[in-house]
Each structure stands twice: as structure tokens, then as C-alpha cells.
């Protein structure tokens, strides 16, 4: 298959850290994935082509590959090559970061950085954490430090996140010399900078319109205020109706929470200046998350 040949040659040329035998087995796993169309250990083992080996031994072969500590160490080189290939023409790429559930068991959760290209999300870097570390500063700092090693040195990315990422995340991103764009919700408090009394975000919502509005430079939070620019925007209603089947617990309270969240205006915050990027452009960038 031509695509596997190109992939093998690229990894052989740009990732010399990977041992030849491990690289060959990795290509066997890639071909098995294409044949199986399902990424599980047993499916990979059962769909290895061109071998007379018993299925049990093929599954064990995939198990050894996935658990190989050398391959886990060498995967950083693959991420670096992939990021360099994707971002070579971008000096300030927009990188979307979010948590993603691991469906089996819910013991692990993935934190993923991706780039949106022509309506499609392509992963730049991801790693898993125990579920108890979801949203913690420990996980965020570790992820950002590893992401810095993956990205080329000559770029300054714009990191886009949802309302689950707060001031400690923004400070860490800024410490790395990057730009950030996020959303604040709920009981977040701000005050106009440099002088002004404190306001709740909900007091701003009536001012939101379909045209993005620059609120101004604000100090976010009270105890450890973070200076940033704030943009307010209300997206037009999409006319969606809650028509879930009664067999899928359509009366669960979470449904009403999701509906209220979808109707809330966007309060976006960033360390970019309005001269560098207009309010409407910031809204357009944030919409790439959807």
C-alpha cells in the first residue's frame, strides 16, 4: 500500500531513534489497523496479513509492541516530526486543547492538542492521565511542558481552550511565551483595569450581541487577578430541539444544564491585543472548537 510505504520512508528518514525492527512491526500494526478499522489490541492481532502465525501469537506480538518502553520513549520523536511537517508554514498556528474521555472503564482521560485544518481536527500531541487528575494544575503543567518539546522553536502558537481551563493554565501558557484564548463562565468575577469595581460575568450577558464587542482590558479573578482583554458575543440560535428518545434518559437534569450552557453568551479572554487580532476574528477562531 502506497501510503504505508511513504509513512515508513518518512519515519525511517526523520525519526532515526526508532529501531528498524520496531519500525517494521509498527508498520505491520498500521496495516492491521487499516484492515480492522478498529483500534483494539485483539483486532490488531487478528488482522495481521501475510503471516501463518497462530492468532494467539499475533495478538501477543501486538501486545509486546504496545507495551514496549523503548517505543513509548521514541514516540516523542514522531510527534516532533509530525508537528514540524504540519506547522512549517505557520508562525502562529491555532492549537485547540481539550480533555477527551477514554470510553472504556473511565479510569483514564486524555488531554489532546490538535490543529483544525479545513474543518478537520488533526492531533499534534496527546497523552493520558488518571481520571483523578482531570483539570488539575499538575496535569496541565506536565502537558504544556511536553507540548513545548513537540512544537518547533520558531513558532508562537495561540492556545484555544474552553471554560474548563482557568487562570493557572493561562499563566503557564503565557510563561512559555505563547498566546492564549479561552472562555470564562459562571461565577467568574472581573473588574475593569486599572481601576473599577468588581462585576460578575452574568451582569455582562444582557450587553451581548451578535456582533463581537470588545469589553476592554480587565483583571480576571479577585485574589490573583490576571490582566487580559475581554470580548463578548452572543451566537444566533440554531433552532435545535431536545428530541432525545425516552429510552436514553431524556429527562436527565444534565440535559437542562447543557441547554442553558448553549444559550449563554461567550465571554472570551485573551492576552492578545485588539490591534493584533480583532474581536470578530477571535470569535471565529474560538468557533473552530465546535
Predicted regions and their residues:
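Single, function-defining residue in the core of a domain
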Residues: 1-38, 46, 77-78, 90-93, ...
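Nucleic-acid substrate recognition interfaces
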Residues: 34, 50, 68
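Residues within the helices of the helix-turn-helix
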Residues: 42
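Short, basic interhelical loop/turn and adjoining N-cap
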Residues: 48-61
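Active-site-proximal, Lys/Arg-enriched surface segment
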Residues: 59-118
